[in-house]
């Protein structure tokens, strides 16, 4: 396994694979890796000849008062984990390598689907994601890229970006990795206190109860109200509880496929989760 820190070095490492037309898979991360990230790499190994994982804490997707400065940088630990699952190349650039010495002048904004959910409470976040992912796609030039479904809205933004800009990359969403008690794996789970960690699985438990109620014919508005109530009663400060079509458009009257979304703070830690629901016709 190689580790490259410059664009030039990565290009040189990938040129032999490109000339022999090998399939390049790409997993973009911000490091502080957990089993969810490693599942993305495992999936990439199944489908691709060469797997590149980027580790870059992207400053322009963090808003004011968010945790950019405190976000864990664990490159040595991450490298050991990636070697164990067969990663071929780590790309770990500096901020200067990615953005130069001057403020960026180009912005990329994916309209409509970034207007609500996490986009409403984190203004500019998805623009920052769109810029860094586009840059990474142009640097790595993968055939396939892998993203987790926990960040469902982000996955939708990336799919739209690739479609609108005619990027020749297949985007694969990988199911949410969960701990034994259902909590969606996240690098930010490490911020939770021991007591908060005991409460955190309430999100997934409440989503599963909401799914059960929908199958029983309970009205969606009532299901969402109870979901929010349960989370608030458990000690969460709820950002949003919503339901959308799989393409993130508002629910129409006869939609049978939908996605339930939760974003809530527990103490100082913001947690997100979602659950895809298929109702019987």
Curated annotation (Swiss-Prot):
Q: What is this protein called?
A: Pantothenate synthetase
One cellular-component annotation, GO = cytosol
User: What NCBIfam families does the record tag this protein with?
Assistant: cyt_tran_rel, panC
Which residues does ATP bind? Answer: 30-37, 148-151, 177, 185-188
In UniProt terms, what function does this protein have?
A: Catalyzes the condensation of pantoate with beta-alanine in an ATP-dependent reaction via a pantoyl-adenylate intermediate.
Please write the reaction equations for the catalytic activity of this protein: (R)-pantoate + beta-alanine + ATP = (R)-pantothenate + AMP + diphosphate + H(+)
**Where primarily located?**
cytoplasm
Q: Where is the active site?
A: 37
């Amino acid at each position: 396994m190689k580790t490259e820190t410059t664009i030039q070095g990565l290009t040189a490492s990938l040129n032999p694979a490109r000339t022999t037309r090998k399939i390049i898979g790409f997993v973009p991360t911000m490091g502080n890796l957990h089993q969810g990230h490693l599942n993305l790499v495992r999936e990439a190994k199944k489908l691709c000849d060469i797997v590149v994982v980027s580790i870059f804490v992207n400053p322009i997707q963090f808003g004011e008062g968010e945790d950019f400065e405190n976000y864990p940088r664990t490159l040595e630990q991450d490298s050991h984990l990636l070697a164990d699952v067969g990663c071929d190349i780590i790309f770990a650039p500096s901020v200067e390598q990615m953005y130069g010495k001057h403020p960026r002048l180009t912005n990329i904004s994916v309209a409509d689907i970034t207007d609500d959910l996490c986009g409403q409470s984190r203004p500019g976040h998805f623009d920052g994601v769109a810029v860094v992912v586009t840059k990474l796609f142009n640097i790595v030039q993968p055939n396939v890229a892998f993203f987790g479904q926990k960040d469902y809205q982000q996955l939708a933004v990336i799919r739209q970006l690739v479609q609108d800009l005619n990027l020749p990359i297949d985007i694969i969403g990988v199911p949410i990795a969960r701990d034994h008690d259902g909590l969606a794996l996240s690098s930010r789970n490490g911020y939770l206190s021991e007591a908060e960690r005991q409460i955190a699985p309430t999100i997934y438990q409440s989503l599963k109860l909401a799914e059960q109620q929908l199958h029983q014919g309970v009205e969606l508005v009532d299901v969402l109200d109870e979901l929010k109530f349960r989370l608030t009663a458990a000690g969460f400060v709820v950002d949003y509880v919503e339901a959308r079509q799989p393409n993130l458009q508002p629910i129409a009257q006869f939609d049978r496929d939908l996605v339930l979304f939760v974003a809530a703070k527990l103490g100082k830690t913001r947690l997100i989760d979602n659950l895809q629901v298929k109702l019987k016709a």
